[in-house]
Each structure stands twice: as structure tokens, then as C-alpha cells.
Amino acid sequence: MLVKVYGAAVQGIDATIVTIEVNSSRGIKFFLVGLPDSAVKESHERIISALRVNGYKFPTSQIVINMAPADIRKEGSSYDLPLAIGILAAAKIVSEEKLSRYLIIGELSLDGSLQPIKGALSIAISAREQGFEGFILPRQNAREAAVVNHLNVYGVANIKEVIEFFNVERELKPTIVNTREEFYKNQENFPYDFADVKGQESVKRALEVAAAGGHNLIMIGAPGSGKSMMAKRLPGILPPLSLGESLETTKIHSVAGKLGKDSSLIATRPFRSPHHTISQVAMVGGGANPQPGEISLAHHGVLFLDELPEFNRSVLEVLRQPLEDRHISISRAKYSLDYPASFMLVASMNPCPCGYYNHPTKACVCNPGQVQRYLNRISGPLLDRIDIQIEIVPVPFEKISEKQQAESSASIRERVICARKMQEKRFANHPGVYCNAQMESRLLHLYAEPDEQGLNLLRNAMTRLNLSARAYDRILKVARTIADLDHSEQVTSIHLAEAISYRNLDRESWAG
């Protein structure tokens, strides 16, 4: 007897429906075809054990299973449940009447309980697009999948529940999530606030400019000057995620298996801070079974690289293309995957090996050559892609001991949102451009052309600091953002002067 059940394969951050054909005939062999990996092939033993523990017998007839389309590799153990249901249906133990209306996914334990899977949200979206009535999956993933409207999502704990459901011996209750309520309820959930930071007004201003224009930023300062503390507060002043951005961000984290138990939508911008020992694959994604890397997990959020020179140079160099293209392509011999990677890069570093170069009170013990070698760990092309380079000096005791509370993140965020709205209006007719940091040269000439006084200032700065053409564009982008914060349509010399001041690593005084 031939029956069909439906599962799904995750490719990149999207899912493809997999048709599982099960044919039962005379004989005793078990065949599984359709490009399954070793984990899928091992499902035979898990299914036998799960059925036996729950009082069902594995059929003694010959079982042939085909997983189509055959050109897509089927990876992981999430096919256990649909394979088991298909085998039982072919043996007439499970009714096949409702099988075509449901997409089924889940990993089986030996006792028949279901383990969580990766990519539940992507699979749910694909199930709705293909017109399935319902989606049956492990209970731990039910809330994540239930954010998809117009699809009945059933979270189950054991294979027995699924068997009894198809045999009309049990009713399954759909998991219901009010997507918009869930999303907006968690949007203001920020653990850190700029109100807790004393002093550092110039750094706060630089972070505000970075947030307003989506600019990459690096902070240079001595140990303990507050670089990490400031970076952690950046997501709290960024504009809130839109529902579409939230859905895309959640899909990436779902595919990577980074969503917590019973999670639904990610409502706040991601903040990723990998250790400096991270590998290239972990940073950009890939591997034997390709997974999103840190740059994709930071999509629509912040990627914070603390102690930037300590990262392997090859790891830093692979960031160059994603910083420009805002996505990363992972190529293999037979296929290519594309992961989104539109993130704000925020980095921090000491100014020298000892950490006290240019320190107001402590003496630096490094010679100019050591300082230069330390700075040279970061390549010029990577630094060119960082719009804002700001120096942090330690906060004096008088500032730390002040009783007056600093400006809150909420106040700064209001100004940032206002500037972003100006940019949305400006780029309404330019698809794919949402903030000033994404402007290319053509748009810079349209929207960031300085006045005559500003042009002279910029010309002198370019000559004196020996800046590249890319750095020239970066200065104009930052100046455009500063003008937006100032509610100005024209980029003036005042805006350019502030933008030029954010090129600290280009100054002649560095390293000597």
C-alpha cells in the first residue's frame, strides 16, 4: 500500500516541503531513498523503539520510502515523526484519511517523546503558503510556529498523541498566539539604560549618531573606560523592530536553534558579542550542515566585537564583503545558500598593547613601533568600512560621584526615531535603502552634498588626514545623519566638522 505524508527541509532561512512516499509490500527489507543523510537513515532504529515502547509493532513487511524532491539533501532527525506516521499508515495502523492536510515534523526519542527541532517558524510559513490545514510538531516549538496566522499549529509531546489524532481517538488543541500583542508587549524590554552612565557625553553623542544612521562604529580607549558598557546600551536607543524585521530575525534564530523554549517572536534588536577566539565559519556561517553565523544572528541588530585586534585577522577580513553587501552567500559544490546580514558593527579596542596610550594620567610603556603594530592588526580596508571612530577617556571622579541622573535611553531613542523617519521619507523611492549608512555615491550626491564652506573644510581634512575615497563617502554619510538629527535639509560645515571628528584613527597623533 502506498501513502504520502509531508515534512519539510530547511534551506538557508526558508523551508521546502518534502513529500514522503511510503510503500508497504511483501518482503522484510527496509529501503530509504531520496538523498537522506546518516541521521535520517538512523531513524529506523529510533522509530522501532518509539513504537514498541508505546504499544505498536513495526510492520514486518518490506518498506520502501522515497523522500522527494530527491535533489535536496534531507538532514537531521526531524523526519522521524513523519516517517513513523507514514510507515504506520502504509501498514493500515494509522488512518490515511487526513494525512494530506497536515505537515508533520519532529525528532523521536526512544520512548516516543518528541524533541525540539530547528527552523519551526520557516517550516510553518512554508506550510501556510502551500495550503496545509495544520502543522503538527514538538510542543516546545509550538509557540514559535503559532505566530504564523491562518495555520492551525498543534504541539504534541508524544508520538501516541499523533497516532490517536489521525485515528480520530483524540483531539489536539491548537496553540494560539496573538502575534501583534506578543510582539508589542516585549518591544520595550531593555536590560540596560544610558541613564546609568555618568559622563561620556561625547561618546553618547557618537552612539546616538551611529544609531540614527545605522553607522558602524569603533571605540578606542583604556581598559575600564566603559567601552563594553556603552555598547550594551546601544540596542536600547535603536528604532524598534518592525513586525517584518522581527519575523525575519526570528527565522534566522530559529534555523540556528537559538530560540529559547516556548519562545515566539524576537521583539528587540539582537545584540551579539562573540569571543575573540571565534572561527571564520562561526562568524559568517557555513559548516558541514550550513548554519547562520554571528553576522546573520545579528541581522537587524548589533554585532559587538570587543578587543578587535585580538580577533584572528582572517576572521576580521571575511567581514568586509558582508559589511558592504549586507548578506552572505555560502557556496557548496551542488548548492548555494544566502543568509541576510544587515547589522551594525560596533567594535572596541585598547589604543596600544598596554592599553594606556594617550591616557590622561597613566603612562604608556609601549614604544611607537609596538603601538603601530598593534593598530596594524586591523586592516585599512576594514577600518574604511567603519564610519565612526571615537576615543573614550576615563570618567573623572567628580563625574562618577554626581547625584544627577544622566539622560535616559528613551529620550535619546526619540531623537533617533525622528531622524530615521526623515530617512524613510527620503529613501521611499529607493528600494533596499532604509538609512543613511546604506547610501551609495549616487545618493550621496543627491542628498549629502555639502555647502561651499563645508566643501572647503572637507577638502582640507582629506588632504591633511590622507583619507581614502571610501572614507570620504563615510564622512558624508555621517554628516547627513548629523544634519537629520539637527532637522536640517542641508549638510553644513558644522555637520561636517563633527563627522570629521569621528575619524580618530586617521589622526596624525596616533602611533606617533
What is the role of each PLM region?
Residues 110, 303-304, 310-311:
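Residues immediately C-terminal
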Residues 245-279, 286-287, 434-442, 469, ...:
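Conserved inter-motif catalytic segment of the P-loop NTP-binding fold
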Residues 208, 265, 270, 281-303, ...:
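Conserved alpha-helical scaffold flanking the Walker A/P-loop in AAA+ ATPase domains
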Residues 219-260:
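Walker A/P-loop
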Residues 1-218, 222-225, 331, 471-472, ...:
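Peripheral, non-AAA+ core regions of ATP-driven protein-machinery
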Residues 39-44, 59, 66-76, 289-290, ...:
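Basic, amphipathic alpha-helical bundle interface domains used for macromolecular binding and assembly
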Residues 300, 306-307, 318:
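Walker B catalytic acidic pair
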Residues 26, 58-61, 98-99, 131, ...:
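Short loop/turn elements that form and flank the Walker-type P-loop nucleotide-binding site
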